[in-house]
Each structure stands twice: as C-alpha cells, then as structure tokens.
UniProtKB/Swiss-Prot annotation:
Annotated source species: Haemophilus influenzae (strain 86-028NP)
Enzyme Commission designation: 4.1.1.31
Family: Belongs to the PEPCase type 1 family.
GO molecular-function terms, A-Z: magnesium ion binding; phosphoenolpyruvate carboxylase activity
Protein name, entry field: Phosphoenolpyruvate carboxylase
Reactions it catalyzes: oxaloacetate + phosphate = phosphoenolpyruvate + hydrogencarbonate
Its biological purpose: Forms oxaloacetate, a four-carbon dicarboxylic acid source for the tricarboxylic acid cycle.
Alphabetized HAMAP family for the sequence: PEPcase_type1 (MF_00595)
Gene Ontology BP terms: carbon fixation; oxaloacetate metabolic process; tricarboxylic acid cycle
Gene Ontology CC entries for this record: cytosol
Amino acid sequence: MTQEYSTLRNNISMLGRFLGETINDAQGEDILELIENIRKLSRNSRAGDDKARQALLDTLGSISNENIIPVARAFSQFLNLTNIAEQYQTISREHSLAQSSSQSLSELFKRLKEQNASVEEVHKTVEKLLIELVLTAHPTETTRRSLIHKHIEINKCLSKLEHHDLTEKERNIIERLLLRLIAEAWHTNEIRTVRPTPFDEAKWGFAMLENSLWQAVPEFLRQLNETAREFLGYDLPVGLKPVRISSWMGGDRDGNPFVTAQITKKVLYFARWKAADLFLQDISKLADELSMMKCSDEFRDKYGEHLEPYRFVVKNLRNQLTATLAYFDDHLSNRTPRVSESEIILEDNQLWEPLYDCYQSLIQCGMRIIANGSLLDILHRISCFGVTLSQMDIRQESTRHTDAIAEIMRYIGLGDYSQWMEDDKQAFLIRELSSRRPLIPQNWTPSPETKEILDTCKVIAQQKQGVIACYVISMARSASDVLAVHLLLKEAGVPYHIPVVPLFETLEDLDAAEKVMTQLFNVGWYRGVINNRQMVMIGYSDSAKDAGMMAASWAQYRAQEALVNLTEKLGIELTLFHGRGGTIGRGGAPAHAALLSQPPRSLKNGLRVTEQGEMIRFKLGLPAVAVETFDLYASAILEANLLPPPEPKPEWRTIMDELSTISCDIYRGVVRGDKDFVPYFRSATPEQELSKLPLGSRPAKRNPNGGVESLRAIPWIFAWMQNRLMLPAWLGAGAAIRQVIEQGKGDIIHKMCENWPFFSTRIGMLEMVFSKSDTWLSQQYDQRLVKKELWYLGENLRKQLEDDIQTVLSLSHQSELMSDLPWIADSIALRNIYTDPLNLLQVELLHRFRENPEQVNPDVEQALMITITGIAAGMRNTG
C-alpha cells in the first residue's frame, strides 16, 4: 500500500507542477507566487501554526478583485487534478497487483468455495443477478463536459506513464501532452454560462454511455463469465442480462417544468438515433471480421447460399441500421422521414436474432474463438442497452395526477375528486379501470398543467413495450396515487402494462408503505395486471431532510423489511428501487457496505439504484472504473443473497427505535423548531447564491417563495457541504447514541457495531462525514456572514458536532477519525490544504457579494461560482 500511495502522491505532485507552469505562463510570476504563498500558509495552518492561520485569513481577506479569479481557479483546478489521479489509482496496474480486493467477485467465489456453498445454489443466484443503474441528471455535476473530456485524456496519459519500459523520448512526449491538456483546462471557463436544458442533460448521459459503459459492460460480462467458469465450471448463457441501464434524463418531470412531453419524445428519438449510430459502428467492424465461408446447414437454410454467409447477414443489418439512423435524424430535425418504419430496426430482436444465429453457426463449425470475439460483445450490448440505448423512467409528483383527475371530474360534473375520502377514490378508480368506455370527453380543453400530464401519457402510448421502464410517483402516499396513474395511462391508450412505482420519501410515508401496498394488493383488478411483480422506490434524500440521517435510515430499513415480508407472503416478486445519492445525507455510502447493510432477502430480485450527478462520473466515467463498480455491485448482491446478513435481534430493534425517536426530535427541534434556523441557514451557507450556478435544468426549489421545507434535498445538502458543517449528514445521530449509552445500554450499542452491518455502516458513514467537516471553517462563515444574535445557533451546532465526534471515536476505539482507512484519511488531509483557501475565499466573496447585491463586481460573482465548484471537487460527494 505504501508504494501505491507513493505513486499516487508522485502523480499528484507532477500534475500540480504542470498546473504551476501553466499558471506562470498564463498569469505571470506574481500570481503564481501569491498562490504558492497561500498554499504554504494553508499547509502550516493545518499543521497547527496559529500565525500562519492568521496570515492566511489576512491574505485572503485583502485579496484584490483582479486576483480572486486566478487564485480561486488554481486551487479548484488542483483539486480536480487530484480527483483524476485518485480515480486513476483505483484502476492502475499497480493497484491491481498490490491488492486483490476482499470485496471483488473472485474473492467472494473463493470464500463460497471454502464454505462449501452449494454449486447449484450459486449457479442459480448468478443467473438471477441483476444490476440496474438508473442515470439521473440531478444538479450536482459541477464540472462542465468540455472539462470532463480533458480530464479523461489526462487519465489516459497517467496510464501510459505507468509503463516502466518507456524511453526518455516517449515519456517526454506523454508529459508534454499532459502539460498541454492542463493548459487547455486552465484556458477553458469552468463555469457554465447558461443553464443546461433537459435535452443537454440527456446528451451528457448518452455521451457517458458511449464513452464508458459501451466498453465496460461487455468487459464486465467477460470477467463475470471467466469467474463463473473458474469457480463453477460452466459458461454463462449468452442471453444473460445481469446489467441494465435506465435513465431519468428527459423523463423526470418532478418539479421541473422544462421536462415536457415534447422533450421526452425528443430524448427518446435521440436515444434511438445514438443507439443506431453505435451499433452501426460495431456492425461495420464486424462485417470486416466475419469473412468466414463455412456455416451450419440451419444457417444456410435460413439465410440462403452465399460465399461469405456471415457477411451477407451482417451487411443487411448494416443497411437497416443506416436507414434507422436516417429515420431518427429526420425526426430530430423535424423533417418528413425519408424511409418507412418497415425498413428500420425498432426492436432488439431484429438485431439479436440474426447475430445470435451467426454466433451459434460459428460455434457449430468449430470457430468458438471467433464467435466469442466482437460478435459476443455486440450480443451483450444488445442485451444491456438494446436499440433504445437505455430504458426511460417517467417520474411525476402524486398531486399532479390528483389535480388532473379532479379537473376531469369537475368538467363532467362528478364533484371535486381531490376532496374525496381515500376509499371513495379507490372505488371510483377501480370502476373506471374496469370499464371499457373512455372517461375523458373528446372535445374537452384541459388546463395547460393537466394537458401536459395527458400529453406525457400519450407519448408513453406511442412507444413500443419496454421503451419506458416504469412510471415513478414521487411523494406517493396512498393506493389511489398508484391507481390514478394506471387510469391516466389507460385513458391515453397505452396498450400494455407499465410498472407504476410508488416512491415513499418522508418518514411518515415510509412507515405507511406496508399499509398502502397491502391496500393495493387487495384490489383484484390490480393483482390481475401486475402479474405478481411489483417495484417500490425508497427515497433517501427527502426522508433524511425530513427526519435526519439516523431516523431516515431506520425508517428505510423497516419499510424494506416490511415490504419483503408482505410480498413473500403473497407470492409477489418485489424489486426495491433505491433513490440514493452521493452524500451521506442522501443515503450515499461505499457501494459494497451499503448493499450488505440492506435487510435480508431485499436484494434477491436484483438491485435497481439511481446513479446521480457527479457520482456517475466518479463511479462510471471511465471503462475500467465502471467495470470495477459493476464488480463491486455484483459481489455485494451475490454475497447478500448467498451469505445474508443477520436478522437484527429484538434488543437491537428496540435500540434503533429509541435512536430514531431521539435523533428525529433533536433534528426537527433545530431545523423546524428554532425560529432562527432558516435565517441562520441562509446566512451561514451559500444557499441563495447556489441558485445562480447554472448546474442543472431543474429549479432548486419546488416553491420559489418557500422556506427550507420547499428546498430540494440536493441543494439543502450541497449548501451545508460548502460551509463544512455537513449538518444534514449527522445532526441528531451522535447525540441520540450518546443518550442511549448514558442510559446504560453501551454494551448493546457496541455489539450492534460489531455484528450488524446496517449499524456499523451508519457509524462508518458518520466517521467519514466528521473527517470532512471542519468547525473552525464553519465558524469563519458565521463570524463574517451571520448576524451576532444568530451566532448561538452555530456555536451550539459546532459543540454538538465535536461531542458527536468523540462519541463515534469511543465506538470505534480509535483516537483519530478514519484510523482504519489511512489512505482515505491521507487523501482528506491532502485535499484540506487546497480546500481551506477556497472556503476562506468563499467567505470573503460572499461578504462582498452580499454587501451590495445589486451592483456585484463580475469578477466577484465569477470567483464565487468557482469556489463553489472547487469545494465540491474537494469534498468529492457533493449532493
């Protein structure tokens, strides 16, 4: 590990040196000297030098407006370069040689073999493996696409430099390219000038699919197959679909008025265009490869006599894909299509069947090695991506459907549906769902809001089955919320069943999830259409914002457990869909640990999870990184199903109930109960300024005039991360543990830490948050930006944070945070030297910004935005 960490430090040092050269060339020696002086003061300040700390405050407090942008950019860009070096290190050859991760698939199979696990059981579990990643456009990706591309190229350079047999000339060429890429990044504006549209966000998602996942999925499936062959002695079926990709980009309209039915349609067209483009590239290469003359009799009977039979089939596909590309290009350009639907590829099987025929014929003719080359990769891509590239989820908030049906009811004279009792709503909806006559009058003109809901349902009706993965209802609270969507889809003429997925988000809704689903399953019509399959989404963001991390975590666990038990009793196959984020306040945790902390049997039908914002890039942005992510997910799912975690003991449940109640009361007592909290929050964080950063297409607030309750969970967490108090991720948790320990239950808490993955993961997450928090920096925000009469709030919170850190250390029996993960502690320590100046500069810039908000110096505004993105890079998981 020491050698590996030394290489990482050397790479970071080299990238930093090249950044220094770039700054010197672009800005001059004086600016570079100022930046270097700030860096040294920050390093010495972190080492406990009080004079250096004061000098750092003085230097950043008196910095001129013309110097703030280059200084902010220098520290921000260094943190981006550090992220690149760290991301590369996880996939470097040195890393692979240094450690065989205990969390990898191969290590899991070794353990299963040692424990004499049933080969048949392992075989069955592997064939049921499903990892479905749902890419979302949550506005936490602060890095522009222009820069992401350069960062990927820098990563490739680091990979080339790892080869120890390079000549001096070869090394110099690579280093010059590195220097050029860093210079290109320096001379590129890191702040978007305009907010991206939902279509821009979708294009970003598809670019990531093209540049990373298109290579990663076949590579992962090869590795999975090799592992199965080595440990189980068999090859996996070619048609196995252990990885699926879905997307919310273009489909998630919850709180985003810019995602319209027309946008959804455009994104679906673009996805098909991009899929045709990618498959056309693959098929064109395959046509060059499959020059063999020998084929099976069955193949010849089906496709005719040809000198090069495989090329004949593949070239036909190439012609169809070319036509498909033209067809969707015409649609995207609002032109009349030049080709008809009968000439193009619209369904996966149109690609799969002829290529699988080629595959089987090659194997029958003794050419297995050729069959298992590019052709197998394409078959795997068809299984995973299909001709739509990804499936799309539609998401909308429950009251929008209620309002739409209420408007229809008023028009036809049946009263105000929104005021009906739940039983009456259900009875009406079931009656209408069972009726053959339409509910909506033909010549009726709905309001724009209701028209948008109905138009979205019509777009769904126009798609072939499987294009839309599911319809997610956010803030679902009742059985009628689910039945209402089914009715709207029926009225739009959707000719097949689409899974309608309730999303339970708040503490109360999670607690009521079992009751709501029981009511639904008791409806005969509903049981008839779902075919004994149900998906339920668990919300992490809003539940944590509503009740605090500890209470939300326990509510999520209990809800999942109750739903698993309910569906098992009824013989219904349950898929739990996890709405996790990158931060602790939104359910984020290292993937392996997070999955093993789920309730027993909750992963038996696979994993469906959102990958959000910047976490898409960190976990999936490079093919090798994505392969490692898939490996970790697969290993955790198989382990959870084959070596399940223990059921929590009754006394553990009792303790968790107590912790949940106490922590929720503490959290809500501060966030809801203190009248000064909202003004304190708005002053002590850059919450209001964040809305100026053109991150995503979705507004930061559901209600622009509302308070904290109307603020979305993502900017809520993002704002607290900026000032290093990290409040949503810990408030209430440590204090609750302390109270329970003081009641004499410390022994049970320690046993929970040692023997229950759910609880030990929560403690580990707290430790990670505490290691990134900083009470001194938080105090600087208060003293410079907050009215004195509100200082008490910050002082109380910081005291609580310090007490909580000691509580967690007492549980881990360590004297320092992250002692058992020293490389993470070292990474945080290194980042702090560069993040601290950005925090202190942000305080100064917020002060200047707020002094005269009507006449802000453009340099101040630009530099403020840079500090926001820089701190996000330093913290890694932003929202």
